[in-house]
Amino acid sequence: MKAIRVHQHGGPEVLSYEDAADPIPEAGQAVVGLEAIGLNYIDTYHREGLYPIDLPCTPGVEAAGTVTAIGAGVTQVKVGDRVGYAGALGAYAQASVVAAERLVPLPDDVTAEAAAAVLLQGMTAHYLATGSYPLKSGDTALIHAAAGGVGLLLVQMAKMRGARVLATVSTDEKEQLARGAGADEVIRYADTDFELEVQRLTDNEGVEVVFDSVGKTTFDKGLNLLKPRGTMVLFGQSSGPVAAVDPQVLSQKGSIFLTRPTLVHYTLTRQDQLHRAGEVLDWVGTGKLDVR
């Protein structure tokens, strides 16, 4: 089969399109003939060596296709099943071998392309909106980078759960995307101090939760915008890592909560994964969730 391989860390130039051995499943594994793959920022981290992985490797952690072979003891899937997955290396190929328990079934009304485009980011948005801080009607949420892959899905899920959404973006085009996803208010942080604008929009009351994937440049102001007992959900650092936080600061700002979650810890069991992926794929299939 053909695959894109990485033999040394570096930029896009280290990606090598080459022949690779056909995968053979071991016990508990399944081979998936891939029809679509998802591209994610984490792929660049693997390629550049920011997240250590053994080399050589086939990058890519998200894909969808059809099961073509199974190893001994596999009961979760069978040959011919349409499946998707997120979180296992090896997607930049015509086929990949994956632990069968990490595969999720695709509904008939969801294409492989749609599944590969939504599983990783969709499950991330799902755990943020239902796990890290379970949004409810009456909540006000501040969502940074609201026009990004996770951001657009998170805005939609927040609205499904009845929250008021204040979104930050950087450009006119992204403002339109965030509004199209349902954001109630959109703040252009390049033109406006988002802290002052959120204070104005909330009559200085603040918000129940901040979802922050930006990190260094937004974190401190986000803490200032939380209501007493509010929650800061820091799930990324596109502007750089956040400095160490003195726990006393959380008390001083109103007994607020801080969490730094990852998808891995919200899909530890097959039941967790089937629940999150199942809801996301159902929303895609029924048109409740728009995937770009």
Predicted feature residues:
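Hydrophobic/small residue at the entry helix of a nucleotide-binding pocket
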Residues: 150
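NAD(P)H dinucleotide-binding glycine-rich loop of Rossmann-like/cofactor-binding domains
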Residues: 36, 45, 84-147
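Adenosine-nucleotide cofactor-binding segment
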Residues: 159-218, 269-272
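Short, glycine/polar-rich helix-capping loops at beta-to-alpha or helix-loop-helix junctions
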Residues: 91-94, 169-177, 242-247
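Glycine-rich beta-strand-centered segment in the early N-terminal region that forms part
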Residues: 21-38, 48-90
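Glycine-rich phosphate-binding loop and adjacent beta-alpha segment
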Residues: 169, 217-289
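Short glycine-centered segments of the SAM/dcSAM-binding site in methyltransferase folds
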Residues: 82, 140, 164, 230-231, ...
